[in-house]
Regions:
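Interfacial non-cytosolic loop connecting adjacent transmembrane helices
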Residues: 34-38, 91-114
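Juxtamembrane helix-break-helix junctions at the cytosolic face
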Residues: 58-71
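Individual transmembrane alpha-helices with interfacial aromatic-anchor signatures
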Residues: 6, 43, 105-127
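C-terminal TM-helix exit segments that contain a strictly Trp-centered aromatic cap at the helix terminus
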Residues: 19-24, 83-95
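Cytosolic juxtamembrane helix at the C-terminal end of the final transmembrane segment
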Residues: 126-146
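Short, aromatic-rich membrane-interface segments at the entry and exit
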Residues: 7, 70-74
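Interfacial loop at the N-terminal end of multi-pass membrane proteins
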Residues: 2-3, 7-56
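Transmembrane alpha-helical segments of multi-pass membrane proteins
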Residues: 73-86
Length: 146
């Protein structure tokens, strides 16, 4: 199960998804001296997207005997990771726009570590899908030799 490289990639992807839930995506220092932050846990849809990503990655690890289903779930998970990436940047922009519309000036703002984790997620899931595909090709070639 964990002996296969794609299982390791899926486990790392689940860890990256969990880290995305733990850390802030964006922090801003406001002109009135306070700070505000956006994290995935505070937005319901973003939280659900990351939970789905984590569950699909962990579920994919245990589907090692059903490689075609594992491959499809991993591709589907990549789509969820793209959706999470796009939606988290939308949430950050909406938060910044609400602050500015509310008359609060942002003196400095920066994306945090967790905002780049969906990119790592996509890469890890792609590597896992590639490993699953190679496994499937290897099994088919061995079946032809029998």
């Amino acid at each position: 199960m964990i002996q296969r490289i794609q299982s390791l990639y899926l486990l790392l992807a689940a860890g990256a998804g969990a880290a995305s839930l733990s850390f802030d995506l964006w922090k801003a220092k406001l002109s009135n001296g306070t700070q505000t932050a956006v994290n995935a846990s505070s937005n319901y849809l973003l939280f659900v997207l990351y939970v789905i990503i984590i569950l699909l990655a962990l579920g994919g690890i245990f589907l090692f005997k059903k490689r075609k289903l594992q491959f499809r779930l991993t591709i589907f998970n990549i789509l969820f990771a793209f959706a999470a990436l796009g939606y988290q940047y939308y949430v950050v922009q909406q938060t910044a726009n609400k602050l500015v519309a509310g008359g609060v000036a942002i003196s400095s703002a920066s994306y945090q570590f967790a905002s780049f984790l969906p990119i790592l997620l996509i890469v890890l899931l792609f590597l896992a899908a590639r490993g699953i595909y190679k496994d499937e090709k290897l099994i088919k070639s061995l079946d032809r030799l029998r």
